[in-house]
Amino acid sequence: MHCPFCSTEETKVIDSRLVSEGYQVRRRRECTNCHERFTTFETAELVIPKIVKTDGYREPFNEDKLRRSIQQAVGKRPVSEDDVEKSISCIIHKLQTTGEREVPSKLVGDLVMDELKKLDKVAYIRFASVYLSFENINEFTKEIEKLKKSQK
C-alpha cells in the first residue's frame, strides 16, 4: 500500500482489528520511509448478481423494485419501515453471498416469500397470491393451510 504522506510503496501493518460486526478490518500502518502512521479499512466487495427472468431476459438487480414489491405486500399492515429495510438488507446479503454472477428471478421471489413469512403472514399470502399466480380460492386455501401447519 502506498503511503499517503510520501507515496512510498513500502508500508507495514502494525495492528489489525475486526470492526463493523466482523465485516471490516481496520489496519494501523506505518510507512517504512517517513515513519508516518495511518489507518486503512478493508471491506469485501460483494456484487449483487444479475437477475435471469423466466423468459431468459437478464436485467440488473433493482433494489427499488424489491422494495416496492415488499411495501405493496405489507401495505396497511402493522409492519414498520425498519423491519421492511431489514428484510431488504437480508435478501440483498443472501444474493451477494451466492457467489453467482446471475441468479434466477425465482430465487429472489423465494427469498421475498421467506422474509414475508417471518414478517407478516397476511403480507406473505398477499405476495404469494401474485408470485404463485393463484387462480382460484382453492389455491389460496392450500397456501393458508401450509402456512398454518408451518406455525405448529
Curated annotation (Swiss-Prot):
InterPro entries: ATP-cone_dom, NrdR-like_N, RNR_NrdR-like. Its cofactor is Zn(2+). GO terms for biological process: negative regulation of DNA-templated transcription. A zinc finger (unnamed) spans 3-34. Keywords: ATP-binding, DNA-binding, Metal-binding, Nucleotide-binding, Repressor, Transcription, Transcription regulation, Zinc, Zinc-finger. One of its GO terms (molecular function) is ATP binding. Pfam families: ATP-cone, Zn_ribbon_NrdR. Residues 49-139 form the ATP-cone domain. Binds 1 zinc ion. It comes from the Bacteria. NCBIfam families: transcriptional regulator NrdR (TIGR00244). Negatively regulates transcription of bacterial ribonucleotide reductase nrd genes and operons by binding to NrdR-boxes. Belongs to the NrdR family. This is Transcriptional repressor NrdR. It comes from Actinobacillus succinogenes (strain ATCC 55618 / DSM 22257 / CCUG 43843 / 130Z). The gene is nrdR.
